[in-house]
C-alpha cells in the first residue's frame, strides 16, 4: 500500500494521529545522525531530505549530523591509501584526515544540503571548525581491555551551542560535518555518533535519532527475536560489553545523550523509507528507544 492508494479518510486519520507528537515536538530541537544505507540509496536519500523539510515546516528544528564512512573508505581506495579500524573507530593518520575533510564536507555534506534545499532555502552546511562549534580532545579506544591509540580521532570536549542556535532561530537546518580542532588547533575527525550525542546534550534536544542499517538494538545479534523496542540506560550499560564493535559508538552516544538530559534516544532502521517520520509520529516506530533509568 502507498499513500496514493489510501482513501481520503485514511489519509486524514494518519495526519490526525500525528497531532500529539507534533504538539510535543513543536519548537523543539531534534538531532538526527544520518548514515548507513539512508545516505547511499537514492530513494532513501530523497526521503530523508523530504523528512527534514517536513519537520522544519511543522515548526520542529532538525539538526543533522552526518557520517561518511563508506565514502571515505572508497576515496582512500581510489587514492591507494590503506585504512584500518580499531574498536569500531577509523584509525586516522594525517593523510587519512585530509581525505576525511575532503569527503565529509566537500562531498557528503554538499550532497545532503542540496537535497534538502530542493524543498526550499533551509539547509546550511557547517563543520565543527566553523564558529568554534566543536572543540575536540584526542581519544583512544578500548581493544580487548587495552587503551589503544587511533590517531587524529577526537571526542567532543566543548560545544558552542550559540553558533547553531543562531541558525536554528533563522529557521535553517544545520547539516554538520564532524571535523573539529583541539585546543592547539590540530583538526581531528570526530565519530558522527559521538558528535551527535554531544550536540543533542548541548542544545537541550528533545530527541536524538541514530539511523542504522538494522531494525534497532539486539541483545543477542543476529537472533531476530532479541530485538528490543525500549531499554533504559542501566540495562544498556550492562549490555554494552556484549555488542558488536560497529554498534558500540551508537550505544555510547545514546547513553551520553540520555545521561546528559535528552529525554530519549532512538536507534532506528534507516533502510525504512521516511524512517524519521515513522519513528517520531507513529505508535509503532521503527527501532529501539533508550530512556533514563
Swiss-Prot record:
Pathway: Amino-acid biosynthesis; L-arginine biosynthesis; N(2)-acetyl-L-ornithine from L-glutamate: step 2/4. Keywords: Amino-acid biosynthesis, Arginine biosynthesis, ATP-binding, Cytoplasm, Kinase, Nucleotide-binding, Transferase. One of its GO terms (molecular function) is acetylglutamate kinase activity. It comes from the Bacteria. The keyword Kinase applies. The record marks 33, 250 as: Transition state stabilizer. InterPro entries: AceGlu_kinase-like_sf, AcgluKinase_fam, ArgB, Asp/Glu/Uridylate_kinase, Glu/AcGlu_kinase, NAGK-C. It holds the Pfam family AA_kinase. Substrate binds at residues 68-69, 90, 189. Catalyzes the ATP-dependent phosphorylation of N-acetyl-L-glutamate. Belongs to the acetylglutamate kinase family. ArgB subfamily. PANTHER family: N-ACETYLGLUTAMATE SYNTHASE, N-ACETYLGLUTAMATE SYNTHASE, MITOCHONDRIAL. This is Acetylglutamate kinase. The gene is argB.
Amino acid at each position: 500500500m502507498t499513500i496514493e492508494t489510501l482513501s481520503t479518510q485514511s489519509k486524514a486519520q494518519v495526519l490526525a494521529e500525528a497531532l500529539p507528537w507534533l504538539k510535543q515536538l513543536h519548537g523543539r530541537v531534534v538531532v538526527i545522525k544520518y548514515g548507513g544505507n539512508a545516505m547511499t540509496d537514492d530513494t532513501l536519500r530523497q526521503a530523508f531530505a523530504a523528512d527534514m523539510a517536513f519537520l522544519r515546516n511543522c515548526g520542529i528544528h532538525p539538526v543533522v549530523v552526518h557520517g561518511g564512512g563508506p565514502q571515505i573508505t572508497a576515496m582512500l581506495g581510489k587514492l591507494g591509501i590503506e585504512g584500518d579500524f580499531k574498536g569500531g573507530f577509523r584509525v586516522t593518520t594525517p593523510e587519512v584526515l585530509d581525505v576525511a575533510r575532503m569527503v565529509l564536507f566537500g562531498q557528503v555534506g554538499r550532497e545532503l544540503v542540496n537535497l534538502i534545499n530542493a524543498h526550499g532555502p533551509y539547509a546550511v552546511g557547517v563543520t565543527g571548525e566553523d564558529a568554534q562549534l566543536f572543540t575536540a580532545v584526542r581519544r583512544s579506544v578500548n581493544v580487548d581491555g587495552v587503551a589503544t591509540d587511533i590517531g587524529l580521532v577526537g571526542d567532543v570536549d566543548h560545544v558552542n551551542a550559540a553558533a547553531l542556535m543562531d541558525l536554528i532561530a533563522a529557521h535553517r537546518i544545520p547539516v554538520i560535518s564532524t571535523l573539529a580542532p583541539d585546543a592547539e588547533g590540530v583538526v581531528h575527525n570526530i565519530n558522527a555518533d559521538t558528535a551527535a550525542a554531544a550536540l543533542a546534550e548541548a542544545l537541550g534536544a528533545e530527541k536524538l535519532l541514530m539511523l542504522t542499517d538494522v531494525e534497532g538494538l539486539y541483545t543477542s545479534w543476529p537472533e531476530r527475536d532479541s530485538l528490543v523496542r525500549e531499554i533504559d540506560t542501566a540495562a544498556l550499560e550492562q549490555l554494552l560489553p556484549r555488542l558488536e564493535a560497529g554498534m558500540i559508538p551508537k550505544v555510547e552516544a545514546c547513553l551520553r545523550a540520555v545521561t546528559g538530559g535528552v529525554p530519549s534516544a532512538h536507534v532506528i532502521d534507516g533502510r525504512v523509507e521516511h524512517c524519521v517520520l515513522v519513528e517520531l509520529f507513529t505508535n509503532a516506530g521503527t527501532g529501539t528507544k533508550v530512556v533514563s533509568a
